[in-house]
Regions:
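A hydrophobic transmembrane-helix motif
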Residues: 1-2, 64-107, 163-210
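Loop segments that connect adjacent transmembrane helices in multi-pass transporters
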Residues: 24, 28-29, 33-45, 116-164, ...
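Juxtamembrane loop-to-helix connectors within ABC transporter transmembrane domains
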Residues: 31-76, 133, 161
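Cytosolic ends of transmembrane helices, especially the final helix of ABC transmembrane type-1 domains
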Residues: 120, 124, 139-143, 167-170, ...
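Primarily ABC-family ATPase nucleotide-binding module
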Residues: 239-290, 323-325, 364, 368, ...
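ABC-family ATPase nucleotide-binding domain "signature/switch" substructure
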Residues: 301, 334-342, 353, 360, ...
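Helix-to-loop junction immediately C-terminal to a conserved catalytic motif
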Residues: 307
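Conserved ABC transporter NBD signature motif
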Residues: 315-322, 332
Length: 494
């Protein structure tokens, strides 16, 4: 009783300490991983993997303490068996050896089952996350029944592993019970054959029973032990991934705005085609650059490379005198205002959605950023103004309003460089014109990807991409006069 109480108190105390430190460390490590890592793992699956960390810590703690205590007690009971019944020791050890064999077989089978369960549970979590994130699309297309059927297929595969264990597992459980009954009969028969005194038999039986109980306790720990390896395998991608931030990488405190792209090449897969093919480009500080091209020409990929979200297979990118591959990318991105196609709003209020890139910003700064994004008048008409509640995914705001909030977020930190990737695609012509005029007035370096040519009409230079390399470059008027790829794209919009 005292040992059990001590064991339980120790498990609770240690588990709280381990959970606190491990969860903090894992979450901090996950935030330091590169964007490429997150693009390869679904958000729901990552959430499930991180939740597995707490489960894993608890199981390791409980398994080590439980199995360790059982092993210590087994040694004590073995000494008692040796003292009171040496003639009975051989059959007793034979029974215990059979129990250990069943434990090993149960562990191997349970580990295999738990590995499948952990994998399918992560897949189910990812599916649920994606379904709830896209619930409007499911409702819009009337696909509730199909979505539920797909979820049910995933859930059935997961539940079958738990509620309908494989035949060997059930056989092992039955053999364990039969072994206990058969062992007792064998010990009693050996007692009669060896003429063991009743007092010694009672002492031996008591010790053997307690040793068997200790083995049964180890058997109860076995399901937890079997889950340790699958859970560890599930979090292994996070543990093995190389953090994006290097400890000794130089910090970027300020940028002049110059960008140099030298012989840059990139592909997403080793055997895939080059998305960026030996591209070189020089951007002067304060220059206003527009990038256009047909779909799939590499515009967004180039933007991801400029931000360090992807690593090129050859070539390099330089900001002023800093090589992107060798600087602290987090400090660099703080000097860049960025609005990507995949940008999204956070649950909270409008003010904190805008100032998340500039925690020091005041309400006056937020209003100025909204003015630059041509959204200030819309927000003033809202009853709660900057305190307007933003729900998940920005429901309640139009597509154009969401984009302008993201533009305000990119501008509020007064960045040295601005990157926009289709940042005004959902805006009406009037709002788009106002945003474009405000961008024209900025003195920082601006790189804008746009299909709508009115957005980049006044750029200092327009870069036309085709199949991952620069096909044309020049001002709007120069490119139109060439009657090449740019003029072809332009005429399609007339």
């Amino acid at each position: 009783m005292l040992l059990t109480l001590t064991r339980n108190l120790y498990i609770i105390r240690v588990q709280h300490i381990v959970d606190l430190h491990t969860q903090n460390a894992m979450m901090a490590r996950t935030f330091l991983l590169s964007p490429t890592f997150f693009s390869k793992h679904a958000s729901g699956e990552l959430t499930a993997k991180l939740n597995n960390v707490a489960t894993l810590c608890g199981m390791i703690n409980e398994t080590i303490i439980g199995a360790g205590l059982s092993a210590i007690l087994s040694l004590i009971y073995f000494l008692q068996l040796w003292i009171y019944g040496r003639p009975l020791l051989f059959p007793a050890m034979g029974i215990i050896a059979c129990q250990l064999l069943l434990l090993v077989l149960t562990y191997r089978r349970s580990s295999h089952t738990q590995s499948k369960y952990t994998e399918r549970a992560a897949r189910l979590s990812g599916l649920e996350y994606n379904m709830f994130a896209g619930i409007q699309k499911i409702k819009l297309t009337g696909s509730e029944e199909r979505a539920f059927t797909r979820w049910l297929d995933f859930y059935t595969d997961e539940a079958r592993l738990i509620y309908n264990p494989a035949l060997p597992t059930r056989v092992y459980q039955a053999l364990t019970a039969l072994l206990g009954i058969g062992g007792t009969m064998l010990i009693f028969w050996s007692t009669l054959s060896n003429h063991i005194a009743p007092s010694d038999y009672i002492a031996f039986s008591s010790a053997f029973g307690m040793m068997t109980a200790a083995m049964a306790q180890m058997n109860s720990v076995m399901p937890s032990l079997a889950r340790v390896k699958p859970l560890l395998d599930s979090v292994r991608p996070i543990l093995l991934a190389v953090p994006e931030m290097e400890a000794k990488a130089p910090q970027v405190e300020e940028l002049l705005g110059g960008i140099e792209i030298s012989d840059l090449s990139f592909r997403y897969q080793e055997d895939g085609p080059l998305v960026i093919d030996d591209l070189s480009l020089h951007i002067k500080p304060g220059e206003y650059i527009g990038i256009v091209g047909k779909s799939g020409c590499g515009k967004s990929t180039l933007m991801r490379l400029l931000l360090g979200f992807e690593k090129p297979i050859s070539g390099g990118i330089y900001y002023d005198n800093f090589e992107l591959a060798k600087v602290d990318k987090t400090s660099l991105r703080r000097r860049i205002g960025c609005c990507l196609q995949s940008g999204s709003l956070f649950t909270g209020d409008l003010f904190h959605n805008i100032t998340i890139t500039a925690p020091w910003a005041t309400q006056e700064d937020a209003w100025e950023a909204l003015r630059m994004a041509s959204l200030d008048e819309d927000v003033r008409r809202m009853p709660m103004g900057l305190n307007t509640v933003v729900s998940e995914n920005g429901n309640g705001f139009s597509g154009g309003q969401k984009q302008r909030i993201l533009i305000a977020r990119a501008l509020i930190s007064k960045p040295d460089i601005i990157f926009f990737d289709e940042a005004t695609s959902a805006l009406d012509n009037i709002s788009q014109k106002q945003v474009a005029e405000n961008l024209d007035k900025l003195k920082c370096t601006r790189v804008v990807i746009a299909q709508r040519l009115s957005t980049i009409r006044h750029c200092d230079r327009i870069i036309v991409l085709d199949k991952g390399h620069i096909a044309e470059e020049g001002t709007y008027e120069e490119l139109m006069a060439k009657k090449g790829l740019f003029s072809e794209i332009a005429f399609r919009q007339l």
